[in-house]
Amino acid sequence: MEDSDLSITNIRDFLTELPKLAKCEYSETTSYLLWKTLNLRLKHSDNDINWRSLVSILNSEAWENEKYRDILNGRKWRTLEFENDHHSVGNMHIGTACTRLCFPSETIYYCFTCSTNPLYEICELCFDKEKHVNHSYVAKVVMRPEGRICHCGDPFAFNDPSDAFKCKNELNNIPISNDNSNVTDDENVISLLNYVLDFLIDVTVSYKEEAEAHSSERKASSLMHPNQNSITDDIMEKHECEPLVNDENFVFFDNNWSNTRKEAHMEWAIQIEEEECNVHYMDLASTITRILNTPVEYAISITKALEDSHDVVTVLQSENFFEIDQIAKEFQKENIVVHVRKADDIFKRKLTDDLTDWLYSLCFKAATSLQNKYALRISMLDVWYSHFSKMRVSPTNTNPDFSKINLLGGFLISNEDSDESWFKPWSLENIEDERISKILTNYNERLIRAHSPNTVSHFYNFYGSRFQYIIINSINILSKKSKFKMLKIMASLFSLRDESRKFLAAQYIDVYLSVLYDAVASDAKECQVTLMSILGQYTFQDPSIANMTISSGFIERTIRFAFTLMAFNPEDLMSYLPISLYNGFKLPTETIRNRRTIICFKDLCTIMSANTVPEELLSNEAIFNAIIESFSEFSNVLPLKRETKEHVEVENFDFSAFYFFFSSILIMTDGYTRSISLVKDAAFRKQIVLKLLDVAQTREFESLTNSRKAISPDNASTNENDSNKATLSTVRETICNYVAETINFQVGVNTQYFFNPMSYLFKFVIQWSQCGRYEPIPASLTNYINLFEVFQDKQKALYISESALSTLVLIGQINVGFWVRNGTPITHQARMYTKYSMREFTYISDIFNVQFSMAMCNPDELMVTYLSRWGLKHWANGVPMYDYPDTETTVAVVNECILLLIQLLTEVRSLVMKSSKEGFERTFKSEIIHALCFDTCSYAQIVNCIPEHITKHPSFDIYLEKYANYTSPVSLTDNGIFVLKEKYKDEIDPYYIGLSSSRRYDVEKNIRLNMANLKKMKYEDTFVPAKKVKDLLKNTLFSGLYSISSVNTFGLFLKNTLDHIIKYDYDNLLPRVVHLIHLCVVNNLNEFMGILWHEYAIVDTEFCHYHSIGSILYYCLLKDNFSESHGKIREIFRYLMETAPHVNVNSYLREQTTSYTPGILWPTKEDKSHKDKEFERKKHLARLRKKKLMKKLAQQQMKFMENNSVDTSDISTPRTTSPSLSPTRINAENSSNTINSCCDDDCVFCKMPKDDDVFVYFSYQERNICDHGIDFTNPTDVNRINSLFSGKQTKDSAIQENPQDDDGTRLKFTSCEPVLRACGHGSHTKCLSGHMKSIRGIQNQTTKNIPLSYGSGLIYCPVCNSLSNSFLPKTNDIDKRTSSQFFMCIEKRSEAEENLDPMSSICIKAAMILGDLQGKKVTTIEDAYKVVNSVFINTISNTELRLRSHKKEGKIVNMERISSQCILTLHLVCELKSFIYKKFVNSKTFSSEISRKIWNWNEFLIKGNNVNLLLYMSQNFDNIDGGKTPQPPNLCIYEMFKRRFHQLLLLLARDMMRVNFYKDCRNKIKISSNGSEEPSTSFSYLFNTFKKYVDLFKPDDVRFDFTSLEKIKDFICSLLLESLSIFCRRTFLLFNIQYDDDGDGDNNNNRSNNFMDVKQREIELIFRYFKLPNLTHFLKDFFYNELTQNIERYNDGNDNLRIQQVIYDMVQNINTRAYPSPEHIQLIELPLNLSKFSLDNDEISNKCDKYEIAVCLLCGQKCHIQKSIALQGYLQGECTDHMRNGCEITSAYGVFLMTGTNAIYLSYGKRGTFYAAPYLSKYGETNEDYKFGTPVYLNRARYANLANEIVFGNMIPHIVFRLTDGSADLGGWETM
């Protein structure tokens, strides 16, 4: 050991020797020693450290005995050295950019005033709304798993660099200085970092190489011996072990490392990695138990450690390798991935994780973190110096391939490329740091040496920097948490905003292909993909770095590399693949084999968008060729051939991968050509446009040549004069009397393709050549190119749109079902092409190109080609047959043909745009307008019908608010709605390309209805206005768009189509044809007149008088079956008369029609009223039938709503309902009428009236909270209650912005008791019995998950589907007393009658069922009464608790807030209680019990301190009704109030003594006077009474100082009065349910502004209602009478022992007998923004946890949803376990807020379901899973409703069972 001590002279030696010194046991003490050593080395050099003393610790006896571990136990020692002296306020990034990683569910902001590019986000910690006033900004939620980075402090991301410094934390707004020369002088820090990083890379590189060597040997072994027997197995095991034991890979180790290997005893271990565990933990535990033959507890400890650590766990450790290897094979047979590793390697892995943790603390927690980041960057940029001899570059070892990085991933350099340098040195001239400049020079030299043309291997090997080795090797080896910490460390390097950052980016660019290769090859854990996504944001979004990539060759080599990579499956990619990089760009023939390659195209798209050197980009020939070649590779993929005979047997969806990649390549190519819009040099701009156009046309014609084959060569002809046309097979067609040559191709017959890349490229070039980027092109570039001269060849201009037109026709044929036999794949491709994000680049480009041909080429030839492609030759020539197999298909195709013509003539967004931004805004405008139209839509509906690439754009919400008016939700269940602004409704076009056929019909109908309403005209006279576009097209390239409407080919097609419509009555075709004519009239009036009135040749003699388009339109006016188009036709003629008076319409019509009647064209009112009487009569009868049916349905619906309505209106708004739903008790008539109006009248089974037989209502009993107490030991609770008394607390105090100041929950010491809820529906007992018998057999045969306590008695209400486990009979008590009779002491004695027996048995059964559900056995009538009475009182208490949040001034109980079901339940239970009482009228038991226990003070003081007096109050009311109470009724109530007051005094005295009246914690308790200078008389009586009760709990030998008690006098008095008012309020509610109120007990006294007076006022109201003395008299009476007697009784020597026992018992049960809280009941406090949970969580855990966090809304505890609990045998999850065993709030339910998906999880029994969360977006959407990407904020009304109505209102069982029972009929009014 002495030699070892002497050998350690530096930190590297210490790290190397540590495994041996620590005996390969990595404990907390080992970690502490490591950190201590590293921290010591930070401040001192290696020579100044006593290494011998550090090593002696490891050899000491205390280390062996683990005494050091006991010292460290429970201490947070990792932060001691690095902790800042001052606590940082908010988000601190002084001197750097923020670059904070924002993860899913966090909120980010985009300000489009400060930055025009949506790439640059600002996190919510930095974004200050006050500094962006009047800016156009929007808040979004991070959706991508890799997250987004904050650009606060990054000048490049903003239009004005000063805008980068608007951080919420003012300290961060100091401009960044580039003078960093003084922050990197500490050589100790840099050298230490060099050592640490070198060691970390050494371990990971060797670990990776060793793992690959072992893996390859095992694979080779398994391939060589596929069929070996058991004997061979043993032999092979020994041979396999040799390379592991005698590992030759370790020869490169230095002596110290080799000595470690040569130890006699080598430990081996089996490990399982959490990320590779592909089985459930329960299965894993059972497998471990079975294989290792260990107790299940050991296996569960393994799985729990695996689950909690997110890391690697050792299952077994031994020196016997053969045994370990055999056990590992047993695990592998069970499909469990395990690893056999040396204990030494395991130690090193833990060591690397700890080193990473130390580096993380150094960068983020140290006081000098900024200087540390600069030092770390220098170390990272420098070359990796390996301490392994074989890895090290030296004069004798110049080519250590073992440790080099292959810059081309695993591929070889092809022979053609061997002479070419792929990676060029970097010339970064502005780097001021000399040290980094030297590192750059050295780096460039190594980069040059990496290219060795003469090398045999042809691998592009490079000896890289530490940064490069870490992102390639180390990231994958680290544990899950350490990976993320390393990502954060590297991210922090990019926050340093100086020129050296470019060098860091350059190093990433050089190894980009290698990282991409690893990401595709072995990234099962998605680590490399996340790494690339994050580094891509740090690098390629920076314009200066994006500019660097252009000249470096990065773009072209990445595209070429990606195309090679597409052909390989991930598992086929090895570290060194003996395959050279493909020379060119070639797509795989069958399918693309991996999808992860897509990430590089996303980075390339970012470069195209972010770069600011368009001239350099466009002039780079290599990039030009790469873009064109890669884009054109998609030309002839996915051939389509229509199936004509039978449906395809197998539907192949392999095309999806091509669509997946082509979308990104489209965006990349569009971004490349969009750079034209930024070019300011006219000559260069013209040159590049002509170059691109030439390439696009040449390649498009080549593609046409390959895809267009001649059908009949006899008719084909070629023109040898044109080289382009000479290669195309053409055919001569005669259509509409015009002969033209068209390309010989038939859509639907020949094979064709969806993708036409060169056609899209042509569109991109034409479009961007005429546009600027953010504003129109300047005047100097207006006429820089004349495209009319470029396209003088009309034939070429026609052929350029050939493929586009064929694709549009193909889509039309698919829409009409002509390709139906091709199955789902063809329709799905069409949908992807026309509906999703690809549409803007493909479908719109096709339309653009056809429009280009329409404007440029011969219109006659275009029409012939157009009709030929549609296959409508015969139709256009006047014969409506032979084109398609059947008439229906032909008509449908014609419909699509005309629709496309309309769209070609009206869809001019792309034709008239002047800039990229304008086109972007036009697209948004059109999509939003046509998503809304005339409807009122929610945000979700709008988003669902607009393509995702628009709705996911950050600025979508801004444009939505611009074009639509928003209305907030009205009720709790509503969403916010949008309505299109009136000024945009004129722009609605039913023929918009984005509308479906059904939607198009609705829009057209609504346009006409809107016109009818606005212009007060009949629907028949309305029409769809024609879109006027001629002014927009003027002076543009497309001014000749309507030229086809000037030729007879077009006119004859329209005329023949109209002939077919009239002859064959194709009335569905007419509206579109007429609209097409209307468009031509409006936009091309002069030229189209010759076509409109031209008399074409007569085809059929029957129509010889109508042979012009105009005359045929007139003829349509004579036909009633064309009435839908009459308004449109008259509008055409009206427009002609008004706009073109020189066109004499009347003259034309007289000449071309047989009998022209102007009254037909211009009808008078009399003419309009003249209709076919029979037709009108039938229409009238149809309307009557429809009206009658709708009236009947409406009546049924209203009846259902009246009987079953539950108010869901906004809680903050007073509820206005009919008396039938919420009867007020003040003006109620009688209880029976109230019940009748509250519930359904008929039996739910037989539908007969309830009075036909004994009637019972369905009810459900479950435990719920009936009371909650105060925790006086919690200062927060006491301060909050005091603020309640002082009036400082707001109404919505449950919501606050910063809940961290509170303990999270206000529910303490809850009392959970059985509560009833009736749904309001019932049945006859016989009908219910029959129903139960019928379902008994079904339940016996099914395995429904029904709680055992319910048995077979659990049913659903057939009407509302509510659960029912009990019933409440309707007793029809005709003797029910009123309140006046109660106070007048009018006795109504009723004897037991025989006719009550049938009802009696039902009532007793009902009571027995209630008792069974509580586990109480009902054997006597007295038991039955007690059970019903207790349920009644519990329901009263629960109701009062829920009503506290709806307090209304001037009212004791706000009865308006009680739902009809709740009132019905209380009445039914009360009547059941009273009815059972009548069964033992002659019994003296109850009255004597009350006299003994309650009225007798001596007994009450001993036994009555903990009884529920409400039970006896209810019992006393029944005694009074039976004449069993000798005292006056109101005196009984008065005495009961006294006894309750006594109970409260005892409880409060006990609890205040417990906390010593807060004498020692004044700083925490903020209790002050309420402002009254002179205490009232009632207060003095009250306080003096309380002081006497305090003496009961004071020890005799202690003298108590009452001065501290005086300071909280107001608080104590207020609390006592408020608590007494709770009991009074419940008594009042109990009284109003049992007695009909026929008077007004509310006397209106003058109100005081003082809050305390208001509280006294409430008690005074109750006292006055019960005709009792006022409160002052009550307190005075208690003070002078009961107080003296009670205290004397307690201090009486005879009963002293008994009294002491009472006091002792109260103290011992302090938690179960808590003082009642006067607060209204509510769930935990929630933050305003849901993303606050993500910010509060540790970001490391937030990223690493695979389970979503759910917050218990009862106690605030955080759980992991769907995470099984090990201690429960993995049979239930954390949430269920918490609800049953862990929650401190006793409840039958679990209520959890899922913070990641914004939903509520309701748990009940063994079931659970999801419910809408109280968090809504600003548009009123619940936005589950953040699917709309908008932040959600707490809705106070919804949260209150969740608490009061759902949780505490006993609705959870009904919701859970409704949503989890698949066989349940959800019912509804329509089933009645």
Swiss-Prot record:
Family matches, as PANTHER family: E3 UBIQUITIN-PROTEIN LIGASE UBR1 (PTHR21497:SF24), UBIQUITIN LIGASE E3 ALPHA-RELATED (PTHR21497)
Region annotated Interaction with UBC2, chain positions: 1134-1240
Other noteworthy facts: Present with 49 molecules/cell in log phase SD medium. Deletion produces no detectable phenotype.
Cellular-component GO terms for this entry: cytoplasm; MUB1-RAD6-UBR2 ubiquitin ligase complex; RAD6-UBR2 ubiquitin ligase complex; ubiquitin ligase complex
Organism: Saccharomyces cerevisiae (strain ATCC 204508 / S288c) (Baker's yeast)
Composition bias, Low complexity: 1212-1225
Domain comment as written in the entry: The RING-H2 zinc finger is an atypical RING finger with a His ligand in place of the fourth Cys of the classical motif.
The name this protein goes by in its record: E3 ubiquitin-protein ligase UBR2
Catalytic activity field: S-ubiquitinyl-[E2 ubiquitin-conjugating enzyme]-L-cysteine + [acceptor protein]-L-lysine = [E2 ubiquitin-conjugating enzyme]-L-cysteine + N(6)-ubiquitinyl-[acceptor protein]-L-lysine
Enzyme class: transferase
Function: E3 ubiquitin-protein ligase which probably functions outside the N-end rule pathway, since it lacks the residues essential for the degradation of N-end rule substrates. Mediates RPN4 ubiquitination and subsequent degradation.
ZnF endpoints (RING-type): 1241-1362
Pfam families: PRT6_C, UBR1-like_wing, zf-UBR
Pathway: Protein modification; protein ubiquitination
